[in-house]
């Protein structure tokens, strides 16, 4: 009898270890993808800023600080301490919402360079990867909306009339918000991945 119990314990441990290994692999892929997108966003924003006059940079930055991004509609941790206290599933759900919110706006960032043309397909790959992670980490004890039913408000002031330098401001806001949101997703996925290693230090 004892040998049977021991055998079942070993089998269960093996299955559990395999699930953790699979999740770690999926997390590694997702983190790599969002890291690439964040670096891409930083480069595109930096290149765009470099093309502006000093006064244009100052004015656009001032306007942006008073404006808002689509991510402001998505409830997320307010600081690093809340991020660390959030569950894996919550961090994944927020990340999914942030990535999904860029499906349409990302089309406005495409075109003109090979870097920009990487955005939409890489966002799609990342969204698929996060969805797989959500399903793999689904816990009935946690009640989060189905990802298919997540709704997001229109993208900031992007669809509103912006006045004189409308095109310039649109591009600045899109790139700045994209960079900001990819940094958020990178942080959330990195913390969630770290949770799979009990001995790891997940301090931000």
Swiss-Prot record:
Molecular functions per Gene Ontology: growth hormone activity; growth hormone receptor binding; metal ion binding
Classification via InterPro entries: 4_helix_cytokine-like_core, Somatotropin, Somatotropin/Prolactin, Somatotropin_CS
In-chain residues carrying the UniProt-annotated modification Pyrrolidone carboxylic acid: 18
Major site of localization recorded for this protein: secreted
Keywords per UniProt: Disulfide bond, Hormone, Metal-binding, Pyrrolidone carboxylic acid, Secreted, Signal, Zinc
Residues binding Zn(2+), per UniProt: 36, 186
SUPFAM superfamilies: 4-helical cytokines
Localisation per UniProt entry: Secreted
GO cellular component: extracellular space
Signal peptide: 1-17
GO biological process, one term: response to nutrient levels
Record carries keyword Membrane: no
Entry keyword RNA-binding: no
Spans through the membrane: none
Annotated disulfide bonds: 69-177, 194-202
PANTHER family reported for this sequence: SOMATOTROPIN, SOMATOTROPIN,PROLACTIN
Purpose of the protein: Growth hormone plays an important role in growth control and involved in the regulation of several anabolic processes.
Similarity-based family: Belongs to the somatotropin/prolactin family.
Protein name listed in UniProt: Somatotropin
